[in-house]
Amino acid sequence: MKPQVVFVLGGPGAGKGTQCARIVENYSYTHLSAGDLLREERSRTDSEFGQLIDSYIKEGKIVPVQITINLLRKAMEETMKADEKKFRFLIDGFPRNQDNLQGWNTEMDGKADVKFVLFFDCSNEVCIDRCLERGKSSGRTDDNRESLEKRIQTYLQSTRPIIELYEKQGKVQRIDASRSVDEVFADVKNILEKDD
């Protein structure tokens, strides 16, 4: 069985992680966050990529695609090896740019099926406010205004065109993410139940 993948995209603070956690509780999906995998790899003392990843994250830049895809592929393989019923994956925060997408298409062609893109659409103002609020408790080094401005610019320049590309293929499920967690999840449920 090939992994069945749903890409989860949206600006910083759009609620991707929160909604993915809800989906995992209610459906047979495994949540893989490209950012979390990179942060874990960065903090592993024996990691060959740790320092490299660290400098990219601090600068608000996108980590080289081979590193990210390697971590994603390894995580999917390990999950499916542990339990063959777990072949559905939510990949959150990837692909973030053209280079990511090309890398995925090259490396994963025929190895995984992308079902659709779940796009959490939210204004920049709401995203920034949410991240600053989260920064008070998350301890994330990139939840400050300066990093956020950079991350939003990166998102608008790099990730939005990817979403538009998938839209042309009719593969995007767009959700208004400016509403409450429950309202957003109600839309998510409708989409996933249609897909089942």
Curated annotation (Swiss-Prot):
Catalytic EC class: transferase
Subunit note: Monomer.
Region (LID): 133-143
UniProt binding sites for CMP: 100
Catalytic activity: CMP + ATP = CDP + ADP; dCMP + ATP = dCDP + ADP; UMP + ATP = UDP + ADP; a 2'-deoxyribonucleoside 5'-diphosphate + ATP = a 2'-deoxyribonucleoside 5'-triphosphate + ADP
Pfam families attached to this UniProt entry: ADK (PF00406)
Source lineage: Eukaryota, Metazoa, Chordata, Craniata, Vertebrata
One CC-aspect GO term: nucleus
Family listed: Belongs to the adenylate kinase family. UMP-CMP kinase subfamily.
Keywords of the record: ATP-binding, Cytoplasm, Kinase, Nucleotide-binding, Nucleus, Pyrimidine biosynthesis, Transferase
Cofactor: Mg(2+)
Keyword set includes Flavoprotein: no
Compartments in which it is found: Nucleus; Cytoplasm
Protein name: UMP-CMP kinase
Location of the region described as NMP in the Swiss-Prot/TrEMBL record: 33-63
Alphabetized HAMAP family for the sequence: Adenylate_kinase_Adk (MF_00235), Adenylate_kinase_UMP_CMP_kin (MF_03172)
GO terms of molecular function: (d)CMP kinase activity; ATP binding; CMP kinase activity; dCMP kinase activity; nucleoside diphosphate kinase activity; UMP kinase activity
List of residues binding a ribonucleoside 5'-phosphate: 39, 61-63, 93-96, 140, 151
InterPro entries in UniProt: Adenylat/UMP-CMP_kin, Adenylat_kinase_CS, P-loop_NTPase, UMP_CMP_kinase
Free-text domain note: Consists of three domains, a large central CORE domain and two small peripheral domains, NMPbind and LID, which undergo movements during catalysis. The LID domain closes over the site of phosphoryl transfer upon ATP binding. Assembling and dissambling the active center during each catalytic cycle provides an effective means to prevent ATP hydrolysis.
Binding site for ATP: 13-18, 134, 179
